[in-house]
Amino acid sequence: MNADEAVELPIDGELDLHTFAPHEVKELVASYVDEAAERGILELRIVHGKGTGALKRLVHAVLERHELVVAFRLADEGQGGWGATLVQLRPPRRG
């Protein structure tokens, strides 16, 4: 696959970042949040992994600035613990 080709992701409330390069994450997370909210999916789980925490910090930085994000927190142990973030969205404004 060409690096410039778009990848289509299922918008189902869970975004697993393990297969993406770090430089893709900022735009990917913001776009995923927009599309999920547009489809009425207002609770998300973003899997960033445990690793060094760099990816988690990047994801949290994007979420902090996103206008549709109401709140976010690390997942409970049964949902991935500190390797995943749970996100609550507000519906997008219409009109």
Where are the regions a protein language model picked out?
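Long, charged, low-complexity intrinsically disordered regions
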Residues: 1-95
